[in-house]
């Protein structure tokens, strides 16, 4: 029987929703040397001594399959116009040669990305959104202003879903920038992750950002990962492999719909659900400001530890969005 957790799109708000605790979680997480700060997995000595690369990635049906998305350490899915979603993907431990399709910046991206430092790449955007992104600590690499040749238009894709970035070369050119700080806490191994030890079995996670379609994550024990589907079909990368995540974190967020573009509010706190290893637990998310990392806490205020591996963060609107957990 499905457990309905967030209101919107006909999903009722059930009594098992995550409590909002009064205390914040522990201070910003740290990782020991030799551990990838955005993934919690081992890296070769010196292998993390370069900046992270955040890129705005298209999720329009015409943009799929995306390039390099399966190798991102972290992927944020955010609501944009027309009920569609777009990704803010961050690469650090494994940077592909190419990523894309690259799209424009949105008003919530400074709040999402400021804590990473490093580089942010995007195609352009409304002047006020570009100015806000340029005001962050990140180095901005913009297709509309590019004279370096780092961006190209792919001949086998239609505009505007055709802008591709030379990701590894972008990082190499700016290797003097600092590596990112850790954003989440990680357990020593998958079996020790908090959701595994304290959560309830979850076979499928269904999230809805609007009436325009949904996406699902199905637990695959053989793959030791959640496999992603979108609009009723497997969500594939350019090699034909289904996108997957070690951790799926759903944040219930407010959305400012007063302008032409919806703006996710990612400061403050709210309900969350953390899924790892086929289990899910309720949580509370905290973000003290744009430059602060997201913190995840259980009902007692203790820090939640993710399993080492990649993480997708679903920024589900509190008004028109919904999340459904299927045991």
Question: For each of these PLM feature ranges, what is it?
Answer:
Residues 24-32:
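Ser/Thr-rich, Proline-interspersed low-complexity disordered segments
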Residues 17-20:
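Bacterial signal peptide processing site
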Residues 12-15:
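C-terminal motif of bacterial Sec signal peptides marking the signal peptidase cleavage site
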Residues 1-4:
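Bacterial N-terminal signal peptides that target proteins for export
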